[in-house]
Amino acid sequence: MYIRAKKSLGQNFLRDSAFVDRVVNALDLSDSDTVFEIGSGKGALTCKLVEQAGRVMAIEFDRDMIAILNERFGSSDNFELINADALSTDFDELLGDVAPDRRVKLVANLPYNISTQILQRLIDQRELFSEIVLMFQREVVERITALAGGKNRGFLSVLVENAFDTEYLFDVPPGAFQPVPKVWSAVVRLVPKPLDLNDYPLFRQIVSMSFAQKRKTILNNLKPVIENAAAILVVSGIDPKRRAETLTLDEWKTLTGTLLSSKRRPGQSE
């Protein structure tokens, strides 16, 4: 069955078997593993997952792809297919019966147009997974793995560093896909970290506000929304003239702790 990729869904199907193998091998699967695949497409990765994992749960939005996947894998005892939108699906509810032992591994070749939205959802629900292997547009991987001081450092970089141990695995050329995209892709491994923040929503809010305008200093971004922002930065050991991309994860945590201790919240301006 031939079905054309839908541009509206950002579909680019991985077709190069060598890269399919590299993505699946990155998961280091055994027959005791449950794998959750987001966006199975025509099933290039799914085929290998069904062969190697004890259980494969796949979520796919496109009904045309559902028909292909059911035809290919419907008779497999270890395969379960969910026709739903990953952006609105409650992963906790979906994976609740298998997630408690943290043996769920997630894999996805994500459409470029929803990749950052999915990633932010995975940050919020990372406790469900033991390991996550994702394929993104290379620019996205460069951003999410950027360290303090790097030119690609941003809001998402800080959130990902706080949530995961990251490993940039390899690049994937445009020719590995059908249709051929205009940009390179890359694969990244994310291993969830335990939470160690007393107020994650505050941490996230501070980081977001500090990167609101990257060319501004952190003080100029924060002083309209936090009372005595300069003093709070100094108490945190942060030069108010620095820019947000230069701060380390520990400095973001210290700043969050200082705000908690001061009992000041964003929205209280000078």
Model-derived segments and their meaning:
Residues A186, L190-P192, N198-A231, S236-D239, ...:
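An accessory alpha-helical subdomain
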Residues M1-M209, T254-E270:
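Catalytic cores of RNA-modifying enzymes
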